[in-house]
A protein has these predicted regions:
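A short loop-to-beta-strand structural motif that recurs across blades of beta-propeller domains
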Residues: 1, 36-38, 87-90, 128-130, ...
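Conserved beta-strand positions in repeat-built beta-propeller and related beta-rich domains
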Residues: 1, 24, 29-35, 73-83, ...
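Beta-propeller domains
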Residues: 1-12, 34-37
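Flexible "stalk/tail and boundary" regions
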Residues: 4, 8, 25-27, 42-43, ...
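A short beta-strand motif characteristic of beta-propeller blades
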Residues: 7-13, 48-55, 96-102, 144-151, ...
Length: 196
């Protein structure tokens, strides 16, 4: 953890990959790991399992994950070595875990409109960002996934994303050295160059 000046104040080490975290409260995080969704106490360092996620698939790990405005946690999984499409996206809410997307290679760009009525997602190698309607109260999909933006003609691959207060989707491009802002209709609003 870093302070307001960017100085490292505290760090934690885990015995497995933990690529995503969501805030539970001031002292606790929900960690998406290789084997489970886990509760981590920032004060005591205690970690406990909330629910297993693909614990029986040692070749997989969690990847991009995001909290829906309803409080539901969408957790993507992928093959550790970027192999076959054996990953998925799960929905966790109120103690229930359900698979909502299967046959994914690298789940990324999971994000939601502020009102919780729409989700975005990509399987990075496809170079397509998809969208669907979601239930604002539960975070579950309520429609089929449709194409939001075909990014195959642009630089890089779709990676992490977020929706701003105006409903525009900001998408970082792995290997593309840019962040692209998409309008709600899927058209490119602007491209921000980044030095990586």
């Amino acid at each position: 953890a870093a302070d307001e000046h960017g100085q490292n104040r505290q760090e934690w080490h885990f015995n497995e990959i933990a690529p995503a975290a969501a805030i539970i409260n001031d002292d606790e995080l929900a960690l998406a790991t290789e084997t489970a969704l886990k509760r981590f106490n920032l004060v005591t360092g205690e970690i406990s399992t909330i629910t297993p996620i693909e614990a029986d698939v040692p070749t997989n790990r969690a990847n991009d994950s995001r909290v829906h405005p309803s409080g539901a946690y969408w957790i993507g999984t992928m093959v550790k070595d970027e192999g076959p499409k054996d990953g998925a996206v799960y929905h966790y809410r109120a103690g229930m875990l359900s698979k909502i997307i299967g046959n994914a290679a690298i789940p990324n760009a999971t994000c939601f409109t502020p009102d919780g009525k729409r989700a975005y997602w990509t399987d990075t190698p496809t170079r397509q960002i998809l969208t669907c309607e979601t239930d604002p109260a539960t975070g579950l999909p309520t429609s089929a996934w449709t194409l939001f933006a075909d990014v195959s003609e642009h630089r890089g691959y779709p990676d992490g994303a977020v929706v701003d207060s105006e409903g525009f989707v900001w998408n970082a491009r792995w290997g593309g050295s840019c962040v692209i802002r998409y309008a709600p209709d899927g058209s490119i609003d602007r491209i921000i160059e980044v030095p990586v």
